[in-house]
Amino acid sequence: MINIEHVYFSYHGDREILKDVNLEIKDGESVGIIGANGVGKSTLLKLLVGIEYVNGGKIEVEHTNVCKKNLTQIRKQIGYVFQDSDAQLFMPTVLEDVEFAPLNFGYSKEDARKLAIGTLESLNIPHLRDKSIYHLSGGEKKLVSIATVLVMNPKTIIFDEPTVGLDPKNRKIFIDTLNTLNCTKIVASHDLDFILDTCTKCVLVSQGQIKAVDATRNILTNQQLLEENGLLLPLSIHR
């Protein structure tokens, strides 16, 4: 369970990026966060994992306040898949990247390796284990990025613009993978068709505030609501 209550945020005292944001995300939900550029979607994700901290209000993950003193506990429960996979993959090989988190959290080398291999197998990419990240396709990098997070078995995984740079084939593989993950998923994306395919609940953000929370199809078929907030209907709805 994630509770966001009366959250305000600004960078270095500048204009407010988020204003009185309230949201509850239940265990097991697949939640899409949508909105035009610069409305605060990515900022909200960063607040959830403690990359940034609220200026006012509070965020609780499993009844634990997201703050510096609780950061290790929070990051055991929430995984974050960056928009740019290259920012997340930095070890010489795929296997070393995936076992990095368990090692960092105190697992033995043997146990970390077992977890890493098992995670790669669960995503059907064990053949990539000894490859350099520089020899991976965009789709492969995205799957390995998921593996680096999934290896710790978090209750929640956050995805920031996950389809950026994916061709149609790898996009389909990624959608299929996402839909098999047995955890809470929070996805921020401009790809509204992707949100429609992967999320059952949708949150519309505009000018730093939540304008609507509803079933995904209810929001993404509401042309007036979308256009009022700088968005267009998903392509699949036009067909």
Question: Where do the protein language model's features map onto the residues?
Answer:
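A short, surface-exposed alpha-helical micro-motif characterized by mixed small hydrophobic
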Residues: 195-197
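Helix-to-loop junction immediately C-terminal to a conserved catalytic motif
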Residues: 49
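Conserved beta-strand-loop-alpha-helix hinge in the C-terminal portion
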Residues: 209-232
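Conserved ABC transporter NBD signature motif
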Residues: 57-65, 74
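Conserved ABC ATPase signature
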Residues: 132-136, 140
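H-loop/switch region of ABC-family ATPase nucleotide-binding domains
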Residues: 189-190
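Conserved ABC ATPase "signature" region
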Residues: 110-128
